[in-house]
Amino acid sequence: MAKYSRIEVANVMKETGMVPLFFHHDIELSKQVLKACYDGGARLMEFTSRGDFAHEVFAALNKYALAELPGMIMGVGSVTDAAAASLYMQLGANFIVTPVLREDIALVCNRRKVLWSPGCGTLTEIAKAEELGCEIVKLFPGDVYNPGFIKAIKGPCPWTSIMPTGGVTTEESNLRGWFDAGVTCVGIGSQLISADVLKLSLIHISEPTRRTPI
């Protein structure tokens, strides 16, 4: 079961400002990536469930984080149904991120007091997610929006907490644009942990992780 409450997870999202996203089938390489992000200051990792037996990799990573990386909060993304959410929560997921807004996922996460962040693309979807108890909404796909969209949302709904995923890079100007617009945190995947970076050195993950302007 989850080690951290949804309020604790939400607070760390706000404090650190960045949620790295990553999937790889190799457990040992995944541990190295997780450690590199941790060394760079990340205290959350969204393990994206996108491969066969991904739950087995996550289980190993979560055990590693609990044993070796104090304060590292493991969650799971790309979750598309309540059954998958329940499986990952049984394996200790502290938060669930989804590409779509689904009430069935909200119900199983709320039952266990686990933070869930649904992918939303309109203000109507965001409002519905908040009515279902969402603390931090995922703006997805972020690369079809821009910081101006965040400002437009925060006008009538200043209480809304938003995490854009996609369209966010490690460049300081890009990050500054999103945070100046009012996002709570950002999700960064291939722009931070790319296949090319993995072929070079994991320091290329640690260094950009430190750039989040919080």
Q: What residue spans do the PLM features occupy?
A:
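Catalytic beta/alpha-barrel core
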Residues: F22-F23, L44-G51, M72-T80, A93-L101, ...
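Short beta-strand/loop segments at the ligand-binding rim of alpha/beta enzyme cores
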Residues: T16-M18, A65-G75, C109-S117, P156-T165
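Residue-level detector of conserved catalytic or cofactor/ligand-binding positions
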Residues: L200-I214
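Catalytic cores of alpha/beta
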Residues: D81-L91, E125-L132, T170-T184
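Glycine-rich phosphate-binding active-site loops on the catalytic face of alpha/beta enzymes
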Residues: P99-I105, F140-N146, V183-L202
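Glycine-rich, proline-tolerant flexible connector loops at the mouths of alpha/beta enzymes
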Residues: A42-L61, S190-L198
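N-terminal amphipathic alpha-helix/helix-capping segment at the start of soluble metabolic enzymes
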Residues: M1-F23
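Conserved, mostly hydrophobic/aromatic
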Residues: C37, Y88, V137, W178, ...
